[in-house]
């Protein structure tokens, strides 16, 4: 079994946060996340830049990247600027 990874993504949107969040919170997005065992933990908007979004997910290692590869075109139709996407990944290491 692969380890669980918490991924933090930031990116720009070309719509309002409310418009983007309605899509992110939709049944269609839930279905697409579920196919890759992705659990969204948080999504928010920058206080300084209303076009900058943060999303925190938890999923088996590599699944979020597979999701983005498989759904990049779908994401772009929702006015996500994929060229601005930045990611950091975090995991729990037992001592």
Specify the residue positions occupied by each region the protein language model found.
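Surface-exposed beta-strand edges and their flanking turn/coil or helix-capping segments
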Residues: 21-24, 35, 55-57, 68-70, ...
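Short amphipathic alpha-helical segments
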Residues: 15-41, 72-76
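Glycine-rich beta-strand-turn "strand-cap" elements at beta-sheet edges
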Residues: 1-3, 36-52, 75-95
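Short, well-ordered beta-strand segments in beta-rich or mixed alpha/beta enzyme
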Residues: 5-12, 41-71
């Amino acid at each position: 079994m692969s380890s669980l990874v918490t991924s933090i993504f930031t990116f720009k949107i070309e719509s309002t946060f409310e418009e983007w969040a309605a899509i992110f919170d939709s049944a269609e997005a839930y279905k697409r996340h579920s196919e890759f065992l992705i659990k969204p933990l948080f999504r928010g908007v920058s206080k300084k830049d209303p076009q900058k979004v943060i999303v925190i997910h938890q999923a088996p290692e590599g699944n979020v990247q597979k999701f983005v590869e498989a759904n990049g075109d779908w994401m772009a139709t929702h006015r996500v600027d994929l060229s601005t996407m930045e990611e950091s990944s975090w995991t729990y290491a037992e001592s």
